[in-house]
From Swiss-Prot:
InterPro entries xrefs: Methyltransf_25 (IPR041698), SAM-dependent_MTases_sf (IPR029063), Uncharacterised_MeTfrase_YrrT (IPR023553)
EC number(s) per entry: 2.1.1.-
A GO biological-process term: methylation
Keyword field contains Glycosyltransferase: no
Similarity annotation: Belongs to the methyltransferase superfamily. YrrT family.
Name assigned to this protein: Uncharacterized methyltransferase YrrT
Length: 213
């Protein structure tokens, strides 16, 4: 993950909760049903959980509230500061999808919300290989993230954002590394995961990938 994203996260930390709560009109549709998405993700997680891209600990708090053991990984120092204030019960470490402390805790599920798209295609493949190594037998990867069904879907979302005057969103959709459904399916399947996808809103999808025996 590039350092440019870490700088962005540090700048975004103070206003992140406002954005995901729907107070930013540009991203309101992206995060439509945000609390319900986090409740779904938390409920599906299996303890002990490793969470990538903790952010301001919105998902972390829900899993802790369900008495789950959570190990959080977050590259932004400012996000970690806020997360530790909001959720001191969780262990939150500096790191990202590719570089993080090697802990001895057996991991039953790996979760993330709106973070996997910060990885390039090759980085996604490497991360999935690491998930396979890290997870216990039959462990699960459970993500919610923006992705595209295909190129036509991507272009339609960009056009809709531009038409609505949401130029920052349109730029994000063009420049960040949002995956395509078939591409992500192939990445997980090639590593031996059984993967499924469910659309949550116009942008967000639930991704579940189960490791084999």
């Amino acid at each position: 993950m590039g350092v440019e994203f870490v700088d962005l996260f540090n700048q975004w930390a103070s206003s992140y909760d406002d954005t995901v709560s729907g107070n930013d009109p540009e991203y309101k549709e992206v995060f439509e049903g945000y609390e319900d998405m986090l409740e779904l993700l938390a409920g599906l997680s299996i303890s002990p959980v490793m969470e990538f891209g903790v952010g301001t600990a919105n998902l972390t708090r829900k899993m802790i509230g369900q008495n789950k053991v959570v190990i959080g990984i977050e590259p932004s120092s400012e996000m970690r500061r806020i997360a530790n204030l909001k959720c001191p019960e969780a262990a939150i470490y500096d790191g990202d999808f590719l570089n993080y402390p090697q802990l001895i805790t057996p991991i039953q599920s790996i979760v993330s919300s709106f973070a996997f798209h910060h990885l390039t295609t090759s980085e996604k493949i490497e991360a999935i290989q690491k998930f396979d190594d890290k997870l216990e037998s039959k462990g699960k990867v459970i993500f919610i993230d923006t992705l595209f069904k295909d190129e036509a879907h991507k272009q339609a979302l960009i056009k809709n954002a531009e038409k609505s005057g949401h130029l920052n969103l349109a730029q994000d959709l063009q420049e960040e590394y949002y995956g395509y459904l078939d591409e992500l399916k192939e990445m997980f399947s090639n590593q031996g995961f059984e993967v499924s996808f469910k659309q949550i809103n116009n942008y967000a999808w639930l991704i579940q990938a189960k490791k084999g025996e």
